[in-house]
């Protein structure tokens, strides 16, 4: 997990004791007043994961907003640095941080930032991340650690054909459908139900006709609950929300084309949510023309739970929900990322 560490001081910024840098000598300064700017230092603690198409742990640029009662501040840093120092007047602020949008977002009000939409076209080499909290800048002080969370979900999937049917069924392609084109970066607004706000990702042709593994990143798409779905076998295109995200897997059978549809979501029946900063690990085994064994794990930093799951057809599987944030005990993609004592 990435953490932003902010330090406010009236004098020159002081390195935190937990950092490897030594403390700078303190210098006497007059007490801060509402008309006296104070220096605020921002520190970012992260370790890079192994190189991949999208580096989900990278911080490449930062927009910082302080929204106060009488004054707002905006700071833009086009490149990562060990720390950033800026001056603001003492007061109570809502602090908002946005990373990896690759542009100066400019000054805006808090309501404008909440309504701001990020386009998926910008998610090429990294993932946008955000954080916010209320802070009181009184003078020389250390602000609480600020955790930055990803504005996208990670779908890690493996598709394979069971050995018993591999002579007759050959994998050909996979495609993610109903993928959001944009998302708000703050708040919990419901996802759009307008089909024009979604697209079908490129078809990925599969060379190995028996197994295929890959990772797909997508913006949040929470299509909510369909309470009328009480049987997992009814989690199908006929009953799913029109904009719910799903995987379309195409294979060749004996003189026929086979298509398997797998909906994403957070339970075995009624839920069709793919939330930001979650990791879904999907192990899909095709066992016949009308049968696909689907094991889905959803990782999220907010909760844990388990349930039985059947996706679209009759095969029962396991559906686990465990923390997404990397911990000392669980490192799913990279090691050494600081996750805090709670994990």
How would you name each of these model-derived features?
Residues 325-343:
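Surface-exposed binding patches on compact interaction domains or structured appendages
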Residues 49-112, 158, 162-276, 321:
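Tryptophan-paired
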Residues 20-23:
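Bacterial signal peptide processing site
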Residues 15-18:
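C-terminal motif of bacterial Sec signal peptides marking the signal peptidase cleavage site
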């Amino acid at each position: 997990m990435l953490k932003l560490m902010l330090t406010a001081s009236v004098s020159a910024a002081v390195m935190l004791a937990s950092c490897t840098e030594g403390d700078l000598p303190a210098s006497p300064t007059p007490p801060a007043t509402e008309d006296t700017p104070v220096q605020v230092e921002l520190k970012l603690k992260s370790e890079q994961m192994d190189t991949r198409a999208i580096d989900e742990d990278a911080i490449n640029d930062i927009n910082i907003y302080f929204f106060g009662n009488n004054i707002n501040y905006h700071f833009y840093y086009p490149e990562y640095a060990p720390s950033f120092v800026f001056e603001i007047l003492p007061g109570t602020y809502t602090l908002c941080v946005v990373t990896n949008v690759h542009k100066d977002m400019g000054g805006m009000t808090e309501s404008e930032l909440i309504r701001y939409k990020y386009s998926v076209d910008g998610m090429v080499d990294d993932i946008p991340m955000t954080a916010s909290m209320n802070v009181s800048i009184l003078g020389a002080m250390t602000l609480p650690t600020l955790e930055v969370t990803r504005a996208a979900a990670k779908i890690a999937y493996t598709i394979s054909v069971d050995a018993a049917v591999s002579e007759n069924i050959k994998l050909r392609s996979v495609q993610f459908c109903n993928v959001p084109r944009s998302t708000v970066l703050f708040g919990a607004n419901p996802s759009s139900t307008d089909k024009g706000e979604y697209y079908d990702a490129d078809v990925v042709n599969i060379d190995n006709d028996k197994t295929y593994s890959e990772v797909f990143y997508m913006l949040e798409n929470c299509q909510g609950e369909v309470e009328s779905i009480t049987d997992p076998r009814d989690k199908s295109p006929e009953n799913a929300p029109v904009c719910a995200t799903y995987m379309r897997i195409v294979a060749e059978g004996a003189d026929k084309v086979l298509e398997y549809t797998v909906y994403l979501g957070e339970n075995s029946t009624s839920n069709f949510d793919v939330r930001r900063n979650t990791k879904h690990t999907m192990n899909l085994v095709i066992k016949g023309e009308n049968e696909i064994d689907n094991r889905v794990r959803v990782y999220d930093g907010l909760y844990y739970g388990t349930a039985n799951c059947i996706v679209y057809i009759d095969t029962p599987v396991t559906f686990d929900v465990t923390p997404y944030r990397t911990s000392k005990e669980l490192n799913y993609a990279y090691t050494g990322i600081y996750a805090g004592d709670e994990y």
